[in-house]
């Protein structure tokens, strides 16, 4: 992936939820199974071109890093196997220098690799603090290789597009 200078203009929590359905949760002797789902969305912020400091050559994009972590425990003492569900949509507003000189693929790479790479540590901290405040050990998510994730999803999209041509 070639490097492009991205500028972040703001970052924020857009949506957040923590569920602790078995509170007070009786700790199990078994370690919980933790399932983490990650999704990334990008949206060009329409109408920003006429605002001060923003031009069509450098439009703003909102990148949303959506992480959901669900912990389950198989224990006969607990009627519902859900220990907790923590979900955060963490966003950033980005612009890319020399936007008009880049191919569509280069822009997608900058948005779907560079954006989430910047946002992830902040979302990770929110999840760790929240699970700790919920009475659990802090959930420290492993780092995510967003470049590999992007490449895998691009390959899947190409495969499904080529498969759709067969009758």
From Swiss-Prot:
Keywords: Chaperone, Cytoplasm, Protein transport, Translocation, Transport. InterPro entries: SecB (IPR003708), SecB-like_sf (IPR035958). Belongs to the SecB family. The lineage of its organism: Bacteria, Pseudomonadati, Pseudomonadota, Alphaproteobacteria, Rickettsiales. It comes from Wolbachia pipientis subsp. Culex pipiens (strain wPip). It comes from the Bacteria. Homotetramer, a dimer of dimers. One homotetramer interacts with 1 SecA dimer. Its main location: cytoplasm. Gene3D superfamilies: SecB-like. One of the proteins required for the normal export of preproteins out of the cell cytoplasm. It is a molecular chaperone that binds to a subset of precursor proteins, maintaining them in a translocation-competent state. It also specifically binds to its receptor SecA. This is Protein-export protein SecB. The keyword Protein transport applies. It is found in: Cytoplasm. One of its GO terms (cellular component) is cytoplasm. One of its GO terms (biological process) is protein transport.
């Amino acid at each position: 992936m070639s490097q492009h200078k991205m500028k972040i203009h703001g970052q924020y929590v857009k949506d957040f939820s923590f569920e602790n359905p078995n509170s007070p949760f009786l700790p199990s002797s078994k370690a919980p199974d933790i399932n983490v789902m990650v999704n990334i969305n990008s949206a060009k912020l329409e109408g920003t071109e006429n605002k001060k400091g923003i031009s069509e050559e450098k439009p703003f994009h909102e990148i949303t890093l959506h992480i959901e972590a669900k912990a389950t425990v198989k224990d006969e003492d607990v009627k519902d196997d859900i220990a907790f569900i923590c979900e955060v949509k963490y966003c950033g507003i980005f612009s890319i220098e020399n936007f008009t000189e880049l191919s569509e693929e280069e822009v997608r790479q900058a948005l779907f690799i560079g954006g989430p790479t910047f946002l992830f540590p902040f979302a990770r901290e929110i999840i760790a603090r929240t699970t700790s405040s919920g009475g659990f050990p802090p959930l420290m998510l492993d780092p995510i290789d967003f470049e590999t994730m992007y490449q895998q999803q691009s390959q899947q999209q190409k495969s499904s597009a080529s498969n759709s041509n067969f009758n």
